[in-house]
Amino acid sequence: MKINREFTIANQSPYESINFKKVSSEIVNPDGSLVFKLENFEVPEQWSQVASDILSQKYFRKAGVPSKLKRTDEKNIPSWLAPRIADDSDGEVSYSSETSSQQVFDRLAGAWTYWGWKGGYFSSEDDAKAFFDEVRYMLANQMVAPNSPQWFNTGLNWAYGIDGPSQGHFYVDHETGKLTRSSSSYERPQPHACFIQSIDDDLVNDGGIMDLWVREARLFKYGSGTGTNFSNLRGSSEGLSGGGKSSGLMSFLKIGDRAAGAIKSGGTTRRAAKMVVVDIDHPDIEEFIKWKVTEEQKVASIVTGSKICSKHLKSIMNACHNCEADGESCFEPAKNPALKREIIAARKNEVPENYIQRIIHFAKQGYKSIEFETYNTDWDSEAYVTVSGQNSNNSVRVTDDFLNAVIEDKDWNLINRIDNSVSKTVKAKDLWDQVGYSAWACADPGIQFHTTINDWHTCPESGEIRASNPCSEYMFLDNTACNLASLNLMTFMDENKCLNTDLFKHAVRIWTLILEISVMMAQFPSKEIAKLSYEYRTLGLGYANLGGYLMSKGVAYDSEEGRANCAAITALMTGISYATSAEVASEQGPFPGYQQNSKNMLRVMRNHRRAAYGKTDEYEGLHINPVPF
């Protein structure tokens, strides 16, 4: 592909026009203790302290960066693009953290250019150099940002020679098309943020319940998130082949929830990101809908109960010692009126009797104070750690059939997973009300509209869309992955407060190519995901700062004009991205899953075009037409 220069000049550093500054960053606990501190690292002058904090605290590689580097010699790779390794020729190399944003921009753009060159994506070496420079310029000027796993993982091997033993990943070799087990943890990075994984109703075999926790851990370790539709798991009322009843959906969801809570995505960066989806006809759907509501009620009980118990038990202790009676009489309610009064007050507030008696015996032994932990409602507190359901986004998958049953106040059958028999019949409206109440009470579960989602599915011949990633912007086949990038709309606004469409289209084209290259270079946590990601090559290009963009134009966010702006920008981005995809296909060939789905792919494209032009009819294969803008 030919790459034009819009922001940079050939044979000149893309940083030439950018001023840099030295800043510091730290994280301090409420008690004043220091969690993190990095001084005198380099960022572009226009960067805010928040942006600097995020880069240093989250995205800088914290260890293993050599103080001196040398280029390797790789066949058919230009010397300027060759991977680097530690230069220990004089025995004085040391290892530390990244300390400059330029290091990060260089390793990201360099790795993408390197793999793009290996994949034959550039028409010439000059095009590769233009790509390398344009990407670094856009990163430094906050015009575009990739998803977090790219910042965490991409380029560590290419830029610094960082490596480690394989973690059980797989990839498809772009030259041979052969599914291959990774021999390294970083030579091929894990750049994808969003995964959708399947689960079978099987306890210990590949693809089953326990195997999913291993696959999830492999993703969380490198900073990615995952979603799964758990509706294949049988309900608690269903039998087992060996006799007895199943533990049910919820018992296994609690295991996965606890496992996710124990893992920080990216090792030191954030907690695991996880989506749990359950179909609206699952036998255990009612318990699932109420899960977080019930758990948050437990938190309220823990917080309130701990404070009530602490207050009354300390009062009982004080009554035992602030006593004018003699000896043992102080510990007998009949002879110590103050103690009797405190015991009655504690019982009225449901303080457990065994705790009341325990404190009296404790005081009798000569102790004059107790420690009884109290808790608060901070989301990261011990109270929330104690309960389940706090480490995932939960969503209910609803069909048009269910929504019509709600509207018509009909019955709704909950279906057993093993034999498809009816487990229970409920009123659809009552179930819908439970969803609404739970979402109001604790913001979960969300709703995924199964019928509409699959009406816009570009590859339905390959299977239904059954779930999404944790944030729900990625919806596709099970066992696939998507890597994301977002364009900062404010940086594409011209002096007339309008979108500079030429620069925007240029950026969309380049970043579509980056995401395509990322599929080629990536490794994946399972054979199935590696295979299907290679065959379908999904990518997720979007934009950020829409609110700031509209505010700068003086357009209300929730207005017809605001929505029309959003629709137009989205249509332009989508169109250019698909056009770039077609350009890549003309040189590299279409993705392997295209031929089977070409009819539906083009149908969805025609529907996108109709929506872009505000059509109200002529749509193909839709149950509900989109709202025109």
Regions found by a protein language model. Name each.
Residues M1-F629:
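Extended catalytic cores of very large enzyme megasubunits
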